[in-house]
Amino acid sequence: DYRLCDPQTIAGTIVDLEKRGIGDIEFVDNVFNSPYDHAIALCDTIAKVRTNTRLQTVELNPLFVDDNLIGVMEQAGFVGIGITVESAADAVLERLKKGFTGKHVYKASEVIKRHKIPCLWIFMFGGPGETEETVQETLRFAERYISQRDVALFMIGIRIYPGTELDKIARAEGILTLSPLEMLEPVFYLSPSVKLEWLLNKVHNSIADHMNFMNPHAIGLPFLPAINLLGYWLGIKPPLWKHTRTLRRGLRWLGKDL
């Protein structure tokens, strides 16, 4: 079931926030573009109020990504979007019960290429059904189908929450024996069919060869807040991740990297 907010109310809130000096707003809806019709109506309504606020969301489902949606998001003022696909391999997507297939992932990539909004692609390696072959299939997708203008974020392992489908899978496979109370500290699932060292090496090599790829460790690097502040004073607009390629090149010149 969905709890939907009225598009007019949301648009009015954006206008009010803009009057208070807020120039950047991010939608943290779990799946922004589902229901699809509601997302279209929302973007159409925001576009009509002609706000100058920069909008973002990194919660798009590839199943509902098409030219119509991305077009109205551009008109509404979105300057950054993200698609959480987790994998491009059908074997993994089916085990995760994502509700979409690799075909939808590839189709979404073609749509994104036809538009100007920069896109952050989010992958999680090591889920149920993951093998060396599925890892390489997902990396091939990222390397061949994600534009250099866009960014890929690679994460390894999927956090297990008590009572979820992943929790049941991990216990059935003998990977997880902790009680729910013992899982307050994060516990992660990694497919027994993939060796961690091999996976880390494959992902590391792909990131090293592609300046628009990164891992979550980059987000916590101590010098990033200073770079963010410098970008603000230089007038560089969010989202900062869209500058990953340029930033990594500069850091490599200084002998560092993300």
Positions of the model-derived regions?
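Bilobed periplasmic-binding protein-like "clamshell/Venus-flytrap" ligand-binding domains
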Residues: 119, 152-153, 216
